[in-house]
Amino acid sequence: MKFILLLLAVTLTVSVFSQKTESYYDFYWKPCSKENASYFSIVQKTDSGWLRTDYYYRSGQLQMDALYEDEACKVQTGHCYYYHANGRPSATGRRVNGKNEGICLSYYSNGMTSDSANFQNGLVVDKRFRWHTNGFPYDSTSRLNDSLYVRVSWFDDGSPSSAGYMVFDKPEGKWQYFHHNGQRAALEIYNDGKLVGAEYFDESGKLIQDTSGVNRESSFKGGEEAWRKYLQKNLHWPQRLEFKTAAAVTIGVDFVVDENGKVINAEVWMPFHEEFDKIALKVIKNSPPWLPAISHNRKVKAFRRQPVTFTWGEE
């Protein structure tokens, strides 16, 4: 009998470990070889579901720890933990059938809280608060009933930015937007999330007639092609670092284009190797001026996430 029980225990142990899979992914989370990996993933079957742990491959730092209902890891269940490359928490919360449940929190890489809300079946219960990277409030959303919310937002210096109502996460009715000096910049009317009427004002409060430029994305002067050429011209493969075969290395850099078009707050969010990281960060920081973003008739800061790719062994 002891022999049978021992054999059974060994069989179960082998069975458990046989359901553990390891995978490598590139910068874009596509399966790849070990040499070109940015992430490393382990998926293991447990009594509660499929436990997935993702790591930043080069550093070994944990990127995610979460439980899934399915082997394909599409539907999260239970507590989930995410981390920045520097080891600080990125997000934490609980999922039920893939939807947020209970208090969920998000954090910037500097450790400041970026988002806090209480969820029920994926919907915000009562209030939601978000913050800028410097700790100033970004916006506040309050639930008035099952479908109606009121949202107020601020610039990162604490001055009012906007206010209005949301119905099922779509703007509804009258929305007001403000310049940094407190003057109203825009009065917009929405119906089921669609803009149906608007008036725009300059910083002195005067109504403006030409509304063609009240919204635009931040952009590099000369467009995407000029930006690509700038990166190609200034990037170089680090000295004394060689690959045996042709390879591509991608670094992830976050930065902000401020109201004057200057690149600020650049940081590496997806590192590869210290020498590559330094070069990528320097190129982004030394960028020529951009055209700043305009949102609801105000120049605003714009967040950008830029993949920076180095190639080896190619013409």
Please annotate each region the language model reported.
Residues 1-24, 231:
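Bacterial Sec-dependent N-terminal signal peptides
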Residues 302-304:
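Extracellular and select intracellular beta-sandwich modules with Ser/Thr-enriched
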Residues 19-263, 267-299, 311-315:
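Glycine/tyrosine- and acidic-biased, solvent-exposed loop/turn segments at the edges of beta-strands
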